């Protein structure tokens, strides 16, 4: 038996009601399209006990980078290195960010525009700094990261 159904069975047999939901962070006040699975149990309750509250508290629209951070990046478009070159890499601040990963690479000199990129690689399009990426992950501006560049990038990528 797969792990999740087995875990749910054990929890339910212990008397818990369970709410399971996949939430997109951009509907929860985070300027990033990042889906995450949540499973919450409450003793002596019915299944789905939090469904109504979760749905009621979701935003009616996705949070954009601009809504969250304004024009603090000083550019309308920015580069985020794609997992593969089959994916776009240039994003607009007027949309939720793609998932922030634990790597932050510069724009390759040989980068060719993907058909879904929001702009050409040109003057003003740049990679985000580690600090800017941390803001998208909702770290407060005064948060100070300690450690190597690799460790800091990994911490930023693993947040949210």
Over which residues does each language-model region extend?
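C-terminal target-recognition/interaction regions appended to catalytic cores
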Residues: 70-160
């Amino acid at each position: 038996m797969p792990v999740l159904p087995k875990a749910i069975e054990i929890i339910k047999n212990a008397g818990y009601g369970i709410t399971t939901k996949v939430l997109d962070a951009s509907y929860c006040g985070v300027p990033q399209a990042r889906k995450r699975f949540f499973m919450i149990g409450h003793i002596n309750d019915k299944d789905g006990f939090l469904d109504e509250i979760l749905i009621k508290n979701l935003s009616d629209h996705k949070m954009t980078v601009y809504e969250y951070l304004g024009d603090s990046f000083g550019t309308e478009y920015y580069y985020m290195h794609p997992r593969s070159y089959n994916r776009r890499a240039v994003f607009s601040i007027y949309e939720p960010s793609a998932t922030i990963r634990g790597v932050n690479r510069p724009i390759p000199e040989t980068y060719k525009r993907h058909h879904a990129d929001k702009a050409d690689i040109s003057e003003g399009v740049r990679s985000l700094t580690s600090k800017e990426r941390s803001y998208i992950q909702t770290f407060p501006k005064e948060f100070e990261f300690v450690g190597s560049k690799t460790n800091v990038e990994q911490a930023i990528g693993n947040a949210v």
